[in-house]
From Swiss-Prot:
Pfam families per record: Ribosomal_L35p
Xref: PANTHER family: 54S RIBOSOMAL PROTEIN BL35M (PTHR33343), LARGE RIBOSOMAL SUBUNIT PROTEIN BL35M (PTHR33343:SF1)
Family, per entry: Belongs to the bacterial ribosomal protein bL35 family.
UniProt GO molecular function: structural constituent of ribosome
The protein's name in its UniProt record: Large ribosomal subunit protein bL35
PROSITE patterns: RIBOSOMAL_L35 (PS00936)
Alphabetically ordered keywords of this record: Ribonucleoprotein, Ribosomal protein
Length: 63
């Protein structure tokens, strides 16, 4: 049986750590001038994949 291929789009979007899968943050790419500083601060921290989506992301990454 051949090896499972990694979904390349998923490989570019997710980073796997010891027990969590890190993802990029939405609402931080453009049109930032009209967004309040408080909202930008709240969006600043690390973002992780929700536990309901972890199995699907792991399958895409071949982990």
């Amino acid at each position: 049986m051949p090896k499972m291929k990694t979904v390349r789009g998923a490989a570019k979007r997710f980073k796997v750590g010891k027990n969590k899968i890190k993802r990029g943050s939405a609402f931080r790419s453009h049109i930032l001038t009209k967004k309040p500083s408080k909202r930008m601060r709240d969006l600043r921290g690390p973002q992780y994949v929700d536990s309901t989506n972890v199995p699907a992301v792991r399958k895409m990454l071949g982990v």
